[in-house]
Swiss-Prot record:
Transmembrane residue ranges: none
Protein name, as recorded: Uncharacterized HTH-type transcriptional regulator YwrC
GO cellular component, one term: cytosol
SMART domains given in the database record: HTH_ASNC
Gene3D superfamilies for the chain: 3.30.70.920, Winged helix-like DNA-binding domain superfamily/Winged helix DNA-binding domain (1.10.10.10)
InterPro entries from the UniProt entry: ArsR-like_HTH, AsnC-type_HTH_dom, Dimeric_a/b-barrel, Tscrpt_reg_AsnC-like, Tscrpt_reg_AsnC/Lrp_C, WH-like_DNA-bd_sf, WH_DNA-bd_sf
Length: 158
């Protein structure tokens, strides 16, 4: 009989929550400045952040890039219906596509929900006709083009 060891859920205290809230808004803040805001030393803040990283609470630090500022003007949400036996295969291929920014398996008849960004309509059409439609198991594709973004948040906010 084998037992898998599971790490128990990490209990966050108020200081951890403060650190996460500040990092969510100001990911480039120094340990020293963060320590001043939460009344801890630089070393104590660094130790807590390392613990949060090791526990998987913090998955990564990243820069949020404005696509329009670098010439990417088409943002599209896709619902892709896939035959159940091909779902994993299609998902693995789509997650490798540079234009795909997020990909989720949703409830419903083998639905993949996906977001993609493209420089123009022609690039999106090429993605559809040459990359998505030919995938084995794809039954149907429904897409909606983003008109205006009101809110977009990376990660979870406490």
């Amino acid at each position: 009989m084998s037992h898998e060891y599971q790490i128990p859920n990490l209990v966050l205290d108020e200081t951890d929550k403060q650190i996460l809230t500040i990092l969510h808004e100001e990911g480039r803040i120094s340990y020293t400045d963060l320590g001043k805001r939460v009344d801890l030393s630089r070393v104590a803040v660094q130790a807590r952040i390392n613990q949060l990283i090791e526990a998987g609470v913090i998955e990564k630090f990243t820069a949020v890039i404005n696509p329009a500022k670098i010439g990417i003007h088409v943002s599209v949400f896709f619902n892709v219906e896939v035959e159940p036996q091909f779902l994993e295969e299609v998902a693995l291929k789509l997650e490798e596509e540079p234009a795909v920014t997020s990909l989720y398996h949703m409830t419903g008849p083998s639905k993949l929900h996906m977001h993609g960004i493209f420089t123009n309509d022609q690039e999106m059409e090429e993605f559809l006709t040459k990359r998505l439609y030919p995938l084995r198991g794809v039954v149907s594709v429904d897409c909606q083009m983003l008109i205006k973004r009101y809110k977009s948040r990376m990660g979870m906010k406490l």
